[in-house]
Amino acid sequence: MEKVTLIVPVYNVEKYLKRCLDSLLNQTYNNIEILCVNDCSPDNSQEILDEYEKAGRIKVIINDENLGLGKSRERALNKSTGNYVMFIDSDDYIAADYVEKYADAMKHGDYDIVIGGYTRDIDGKKKKHYVKQSDWSVLSYTIACAKMYKRSFLLEHNIGFIDVRCGEDIFFSMELFVHKPRYYVMENYAGYYYFFNRKSITGSLNADRKLEGFVSDIFDRFINKYPVVNMEKDVYWKICYNYIVNMINALVVHGHGCGVRNMKEKYEFFMSDLDNKFSDYKKNPYLHYGKMRKQSLKIRLSVSIFMFFNKIGLDKILYYIIAVI
C-alpha cells in the first residue's frame, strides 16, 4: 500500500479545522501522512493542531512568516514522504473513501495525476460538480484539490506555486499541463467537499479587488518561465484560451454589478493585456464553440458569446450590461 501525504495549509479556520482533520483521520485508506502548515494563523488554530499532534495523528509545520496558501503547500510538499500527495484546504472536508478511491485509480495505471470532481457546500446546500476525461481537466479545471499527484513527478519538473494572494492554482495547473502528465479522470466521483467560506480570500473577492490584475500577473509570470516562442502551437493555443477563460471569469463573475465606469476600466485593461500577450488570439481554433466539446458548457458558452460580440464590435455593450446587473 503506497503512502499518501495529505497537505493542509492552516490560516484563520479554527471554526472548521476539526471537521477537516476528523475527515482526514476517518479514511478507509490506512497509509496516510497528514502535514498541516500553520501559516501564522491569528486565531486559535494552533491550539487545535497541538491537540491532534500530541495524539500522534498529524505533523505540524509552523511558518515563521505568512507565506500564503501556495507557498505553504510547497513547503509541506518538500517535507512530505508519501509516494502521492493531495492538497486539502482547511475549511473543506473529504468523504471517508476519498483517498482510497484516488489510490485505487492510481494503482490501475501509470498516472502522474488522478482527477476527480467536488461537492460544493454553500450554507449546507450541496451540489456535485463532475469532470470529463480530457486535456482541459488538467489545464482549466484549476482547483489544486480534488486531485492526487505523483510526488516524484512534481519534484522532477520543479512544479510548485507562486507567491500570489489569489489564483495560485491557475499557475500550478498550467505548469502541470505543459509537462504533459499522464492523467486519469474519475468522471463520477465528487468526494471532496468544497466549503464556501465567505471569509476566505476567494470568497471575499469583489469588484474593488481587481481580479483581472491578479490573472494578468499570473500569466506574465507563467510566460516568463515558459516563453510562448518555445511552446508547441497546440499548447500555445490552449494557454491563450485559458487566459481568456480566466479573464472572462474575472469580469463576469467577480465584476458584475460594479458599475459602468469600473467595468469600462476592467474591459479595456483585458483587451489591451490580451493583445500584448496573445496578439494573434483571433486565429485560435479553440475559440470556436464546436472545437470544445469536452469543455464545460458554461465555459464554452461564455467564450463563444464573448467572441461573437467581439467579432461584430459589440463586446463593450455586452460588458456594460453586465456592469449594471
Please identify what each model-predicted range represents.
Residues 97-127:
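Conserved donor NDP-sugar-binding/catalytic core segment of glycosyltransferases
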Residues 85:
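Short aromatic/hydrophobic "clamp" motif used to bind/position activated sugar donors
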Residues 23, 38-47, 65, 89:
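A conserved acidic beta->alpha catalytic loop
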Residues 63-80:
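Glycine-rich, basic loop-to-helix element that forms the pyrophosphate-binding segment
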Residues 12-26:
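Short, well-formed alpha-helical segments that are part of the catalytic scaffolds
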Residues 256-325:
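Membrane-interface aromatic/basic loop that binds lipid-linked glycans or pyrophosphate carriers
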Residues 190-197, 204-233, 241-278:
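Catalytic core of nucleotide-sugar-dependent glycosyltransferases
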Residues 134-209:
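Conserved nucleotide-sugar donor-binding catalytic segment
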